[in-house]
Amino acid sequence: SGVQFPGTFEGIREKIPYLKALGITAVELMPVFEFDETMGKREIGGRTLLDYWGYNTVGFFAPNTGYTARQEYNREGTEFKNLIRELHQNGIEVILDVVFNHTAEGNEQGPFFEFKGIDNRIYYMLTPEGNYYNFSGCGNTLNCNHLVVQQMILECLRHWVIHYRVDGFRFDLASILGRNEDGTPLLQPPLLRNLAEDPVLKDVNLIAEAWDAGGLYQVGNFPAWNRWAEWNGKYRDELRSFLKGEYWFAAQAAKRITGSPDLYGGQYRGYNSSINFLTCHDGFTLYDLYSYNEKHNEENGWNNTDGADDNRSWNCGYEGKSDNPGIEALRKRMIKNACAVLLCSRGTPMFLAGDEFCNTQFGNNNAYCQDNEISWLDWSLLEKNREIYEFFRYMIAFRKKHSAIRGECSPSGLGFPTVSVHTNQPWDNNVTQESKFLGVMFAGALTAGSNQETERTRELETEDLVYL
């Protein structure tokens, strides 16, 4: 990585010039709350496997001590604050991935070190027999809509906003936050409403992963109060299928590219509520998406049974690493296609760190336990794949330049709709189930400046037309 302190808050701070040059305006950090990386420690194939991702929280009000660069006590708070301050100085917001759906105390056989010992029945959802509901897939489920737990979550988020100045939160398995004490989904969950209306949180971003491991899927229907954005899982799934050439997905792809109006086109929520993504920490990297047809999680020690099977990927003709120049060229073309579509879609784009230089996890789509070369960013690929990096940088700048894509300009002076879908012929928007071709045009008027050659100054408007 070329930094003095890799794997720490200081290491990220050292990479701020890189992020700024790329054009990044916000970073979403995977869990930074204190967690025990030795939970589930195993030895598999000569590797020590740990909790690398940090989704099993131990302390909700403290940064993880393992992310400090120096060994002094209590340095983690100072170093994290310094990182956030410097990111802000460079125009980059900070979003924290927070986990309030479960804790590290596990199921009935798990340890007792916090909420189990304070009041097990208040803090956790329990069956009538006293067992733990497991809507999180991690052994227990926090009883989020109990008044006591609501207050803890509110105080925790206020703490990170007031003392650390974070700009927002992404809520892991957020649908759990809308369940009643018996697991029933609530129409108007008090916790979600309180978060949306809290005066301390009024200016921060609230982003939901709008599903959970219990089968509740709320993309487009998450209780929002005009405040909540969502990771758009339908964008990921349907665009992946369309981009690799599958039938049946062109009409859905058109909706996703144009801001998912079927999901976010209501009176209050708009397309900015859609966090558009093709990759994240869960699943394949973008390079692996076009290098593997199947997951390869053998190194995790579960006989390749863990991780998602529905990846909607395509290996471009060969599984895994290839020395064939034609296959590698096709993979890079597919990556460019994906990048261009993502950054020319209405909504808020998000991509996984390292996608901009073809980082690989060697087909592992669930690298939660791999604190090694499988998960680490291979910065040597940056120079090797400079072409892809420059394409990402260009597309980010292109998106910033063209406000028509973002829907942040005046109506087109030529009478074009702000966004239109086309098939083989202009203005033919009859996208059929057999379609594999799709065109989208964004149109609007930009203020170009003042005409100094006339007697009175007037603003000139120029057309901003973008064809995808």
Where do the language-model regions lie?
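Substrate-binding/active-site clefts of carbohydrate-active enzymes
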Residues: 1-166, 173-200, 216, 263
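Glycine- and acidic
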Residues: 2, 66, 139-142, 175-176, ...
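Non-transmembrane alpha-helical segments in soluble domains
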Residues: 13-21, 84, 157-161, 192-196, ...
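A residue-level signal for conserved active-site and pocket-lining positions in enzyme catalytic cores
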Residues: 29, 281, 395
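Extended hydrophobic/aromatic segments used for targeting, binding, or gating
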Residues: 43-60, 361-393
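Conserved alpha/beta catalytic core and glycan-binding cleft of carbohydrate-active enzymes
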Residues: 165, 178-182, 186-353, 357, ...
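Catalytic cores of secreted or luminal carbohydrate-active enzymes
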Residues: 383-417
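Short hydrophobic/aromatic beta-strand or adjacent loop that forms the aromatic wall/cage
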Residues: 435-439
